[in-house]
């Protein structure tokens, strides 16, 4: 297990977001990404809570932002090196953003992002 501060982990998440092309991030709408401590089930690295873009209708307005939760301690627990942490953060952030865009777990698995 790797040790790092929450602040450093936040920087890794920011770096992962910066690696996503603006052509995609420009379409992210009403979503916040935050670090969380304890996942609802062991081994869960990230969680998207909200209404995917593909399911939003004309009446979608005045709602609280969707949330992407990154369970930082779970990620640290499965990684052996600092490089593993960077890669797992990137994969987890992209995976959860894909859910925001309406891509389900089966399709992510087909694409190699599960």
Residue ranges of each PLM-predicted region?
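Short hydrophobic/aromatic patches at helix-to-coil boundaries
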Residues: 110-114
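Short alpha-helical catalytic segment bearing the HExxH-like zincin motif
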Residues: 88-96
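Active-site rim/adjacent substrate-binding subdomains
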Residues: 1-88, 100, 104-109
